[in-house]
Amino acid sequence: MWGVFLLYVSMKMGGTTGQNIDQPTEMTATEGAIVQINCTYQTSGFNGLFWYQQHAGEAPTFLSYNVLDGLEEKGRFSSFLSRSKGYSYLLLKELQMKDSASYLCA
């Protein structure tokens, strides 16, 4: 099996709505594995949570948008949202080398 390096960046969203978003900084996994990327947030006004994938030197690519609580599945990627807990996660199944990237929640 080949190793896959996944990089997570910490993001803090500021502005009039007072949003804060925190993610882990990095993680390693192997091809074929299942990886869960957690994201916690605090906000005074919630309009939904986005997940993006960003490869080095490229613009972010949209993966999912959650407004309602629960699990949204889209191919090998699933995203979960709990508004009451200020928590979301992105689940990557059957990990592939092309999944080596930064993952952002916003």
Swiss-Prot record:
Disulfide bonds join C39-C105. Residues 19-106 form the Ig-like domain. It comes from the Eukaryota. One of its GO terms (cellular component) is T cell receptor complex. Coiled coil: none annotated. Its main location: membrane. It is found in: Cell membrane. Keywords: Adaptive immunity, Cell membrane, Disulfide bond, Glycoprotein, Immunity, Immunoglobulin domain, Membrane, Receptor, Signal, T cell receptor. Glycans are attached at N38. One of its GO terms (biological process) is response to bacterium. InterPro entries: Ig-like_dom, Ig-like_dom_sf, Ig-like_fold, Ig_V-set, TCR_variable_domain. Residues 1-18 form the signal peptide. Pfam families: V-set. V region of the variable domain of T cell receptor (TR) alpha chain that participates in the antigen recognition. Alpha-beta T cell receptors are antigen specific receptors which are essential to the immune response and are present on the cell surface of T lymphocytes. Recognize peptide-major histocompatibility (MH) (pMH) complexes that are displayed by antigen presenting cells (APC), a prerequisite for efficient T cell adaptive immunity against pathogens. Alpha-beta TR is a heterodimer composed of an alpha and beta chain; disulfide-linked. The alpha-beta TR is associated with the transmembrane signaling CD3 coreceptor proteins to form the TR-CD3 (TcR or TCR). The assembly of alpha-beta TR heterodimers with CD3 occurs in the endoplasmic reticulum where a single alpha-beta TR heterodimer associates with one CD3D-CD3E heterodimer, one CD3G-CD3E heterodimer and one CD247 homodimer forming a stable octameric structure. CD3D-CD3E and CD3G-CD3E heterodimers preferentially associate with TR alpha and TR beta chains, respectively. This is T cell receptor alpha variable 1-2. The gene is TRAV1-2.
